[in-house]
């Protein structure tokens, strides 16, 4: 018995490992794995079902077919364990060795491994410096290659066709050696001397000038170094021995009727063995060359098919025309090993069922059907029954459970008590898709779900199903209770707002309760307490909505936490007073003394959580729900057709619009407006008519006139059911009501353009056939969109998770002083996001000062919570530099200070929190709510009249940002700089509005002047671009010759003549080289200078500029010398929604990106070509000029002689993220991506914290390009992880050597995922073959740092509770590696120490 136990113990060995290395297998290694050579293609004997000897299933090689029994049956049972039968040669052992013992095939001729040949870039090709086509021609026996040129004129590696080879043979005899096939390639690879080649290439690298050649050499050098450092030999890319997979991993199963089901691999192996054996025989017979060659080629092809079928040529198909599944197909794709079995598995102790509402449950409970519970908790029940002595054996217990004896149910109740179960609803888009609940046993077969968690699960009760999982071990139960319990997940990890806010019925009920009604029964009564109100309501003396005065008692919690009671009399309603009963102590009555819509309820819960903590909030949320359901029932709100009141004005409004349209039509027919204008105007008319109708309808619905107590008519909010549902936020919106009771309005065609005849009817009136037909477009498109959207959104989430999965918080503080500058987000005139929302929960990077003083308000490293944000607002701070993960200095992770608050918990983030995955889920989860389409701008949107002024919305003072200006004769400011911005500051110094103002804007107010709301403070001409003079004087035309470089045109209406400069293309040969310009001269005729510089005041005139002045005219400062007509920018389709987010994260280049200035300096134009202009920037310090060719049709914002800063926009267009990073740095690119992504989500009303987007950006920026290598071993132009360069640089600096310099690089998320350090993670994402090939050649080892790698190798993930486990393990390992220091101590010292100790012990007695 002891032996048996010892034996079983020895089988389960889990080796401690902390990395996985992948490499090339040498022929000897393959032979060492093998337990014997497979020589025959036979599998099993069809009569006896016994494996054939030396075949693919041979028992002698791979092990016995039955446990502890040899094939011939001579030795059976455990006592013969380890004996090798002398008759059949089979070892007596367990069958499961057939899963791990490999065999091998000795190939008669070497064969190239297709992965290293065909996976691009071809590794064999790179190694030999030959093209893939050449190598293939050698391998597949089409031409010879010279291996040893000897003394001849041939070169090593030269290709020879059959004829050339015969010629060479005649000429040189056996002076040289040339071969074909894999042997030739093998010999070439074997002949490479890696060290010599590497040295040679490193020497020649600096002297190479051509970019392409340099890239190629660098690539080859890196490959050689990879081989050299990893200890792989290049010739191992050619196989001489082929390993054979253990037979139980490619099973052969007999079906009934004498047929067999088999794995495709067996077919592929059989093919290889057949051809190999035939080749051996041909070689023994010394067959003619051509036959042998053909056989070798066929062998090569069959091995190719086994390793990666279909990679080269046509895929080999089986009997049913289906391509056979090769070894490579086993691991790649969604059905491959990685994604199917390693990253997600099916689990036991789970069940699924339909869900129904559980309105009586508490928040931490779920209803579990008894039948399911009995099945799920079976082992626990058996154990309890046995422990109780109710059943003697497990078998008896099983019988009892099957009979469902009464005791079983009692036991089940006990087992289930406080044993949480996990509920999951697919698709699990974020971590709230799996939560833990305590089960409550219920009758029936459906799981009951608490209504408040529906929002987190995105569940409804129209047939949704959910899965139940039982955590078995004590640790699992503990984690489920402490971390996953629904009561612990009140705040959303995406934005820190409560996620368990009531919706629908509950909102309607609470809203109904809190409404007031004029002259209700009991209006004007006084109550001494809320209890009295309840009595009055119950007896019917006062109705729910009556306006009354009540004395309420509130508990106020002071700053130090002491509670005091306050009494006051408030004007309120009966319903609100009743609501105050469920309000937890410490919240003010004012929170419920208002109409309780969805927003107000959400705010109420948020306040409760922040002020009173978790427990009170959970209890309160439940109470709110019960109350809401109760009063929703009492209210009897329902939807009837009469609730959809059609406004009387509708018909006149529609008639007016139709008349206007007729008028436009007549104008069009008489030729006064173009077809495009007519279309746009018609659409505008209908759009505004629709607005008017819906406004009239809402006014009609939302108010009703009643008689108050004094008998006077008064308006009050209506109690119309439909209006109440929309107003409270329970269901529906103004837009939907408009379709029910207003008019449906304009519809779009499938291509996105708007149909100009609107649907005037609404759903109450009903649609006619034509109207219905027009409507179907949109409805169908919506359905098709939804299906696409789900798939696309899922794919985006997958890419995001993949790129961010290894980001975990690993230390408290990295100590960086860097950070991002946060300002309130202002678009046009509105504050879209105030500063407090952007910095809440972040850590300050640089001390925040009291405005205008040197005193510190918030010191560095303060975590800004609600109280701090109030302080910042009090002192009207409008800019804070906060820590960000983008600037965090931690290697392989981030620090808690740079991340800030854990949004779902409300305190500083813990170590081991998987912030990468949380960020990916937070961005991906709302993806399904985004739209899919690109907006075509047509009709109303496109013609939004070009802006030409700024009208302010708030009073305050005027402030200019990066603006240069001159003052003209009227005392007004004229802007003479690009990208200037104008802001309105309130009296506290907070920025309220911000506008971009173009060059040439005239400001009505001076800087710092006060402005009133509604003032127009800036004007400009949107259609022309002026050239403004900065000095006064008289003008002198240079190179302006009539008919050569300009023409005069006279305006027919005004009779004024103006000069128009000709474009270079329109000028004759004489004018090609001329540069028309206006020079300013003083009274004495000398050239004037631009103030403060040595630059003469002269202004070049580009083509098509219009000059309205005459030669020698006098002008003043700020006057326009010339005007350049601006073509209206082409209307671009705005990519919106999901595709836009994907484009941003993939860092895709836009079609016609904005052109940015590469360096700071002065603009000039060089020689033009046919379609392009040459833009030259000359730096002020006299450095090297920068030239760029720009297509002529691009609209440039700059003129000759103008100064630009690096990164300024030269030609308009969408900006490319790569350019922003290169020219404006990391902070700007981060701001750009964050704001652009937020814009898309904000449009859909989705709130996501900036942090999450920053986390993804950090991952996109984790690679850099080495600009100079210094003393490091990096290569120039190599792409490396930033953290690796930083670590290497620290070491170099310590040794006093030159560190490497680098430039950050922005990678799209797909590229960044594939470029991770971990090859396991990259291989399980996409392009498995390429990733594995690359990793094998470089002998890479994976340190299992990320989450995905650990899931794949089956360990705990290094995040959350697993983080602690990994930390202790690593610490233990580090301790083990430390040398043990033995303190040498003399005997007398030891004696003395002992004596001291004894004395000490004695004195303590």
Swiss-Prot record:
Uppermost EC category: transferase
Pfam families: RNA_pol_Rpb1_1, RNA_pol_Rpb1_2, RNA_pol_Rpb1_3, RNA_pol_Rpb1_4, RNA_pol_Rpb1_5
Keywords: DNA-directed RNA polymerase, Magnesium, Metal-binding, Nucleotidyltransferase, Transcription, Transferase, Zinc
SUPFAM superfamilies: beta and beta-prime subunits of DNA dependent RNA-polymerase
Cofactor: Mg(2+); Zn(2+)
GO CC annotations, alphabetized: DNA-directed RNA polymerase complex
Residues that hold Zn(2+) 2 according to the record: 814, 888, 895, 898
GO BP terms, alphabetized: DNA-templated transcription
InterPro entries for this protein: DNA-dir_RpoC_beta_prime, DNA-dir_RpoC_beta_prime_bact, RNA_pol_asu, RNA_pol_N, RNA_pol_Rpb1_1, RNA_pol_Rpb1_3, RNA_pol_Rpb1_3_sf, RNA_pol_Rpb1_4
Keyword Nucleotidyltransferase: yes
Cofactor note: Binds 1 Mg(2+) ion per subunit.
Binding site for Zn(2+) 1: 70, 72, 85, 88
EC number: 2.7.7.6
Family, as annotated: Belongs to the RNA polymerase beta' chain family.
Function: DNA-dependent RNA polymerase catalyzes the transcription of DNA into RNA using the four ribonucleoside triphosphates as substrates.
Name of protein: DNA-directed RNA polymerase subunit beta'
Protein species of origin: Shewanella sp. (strain MR-7)
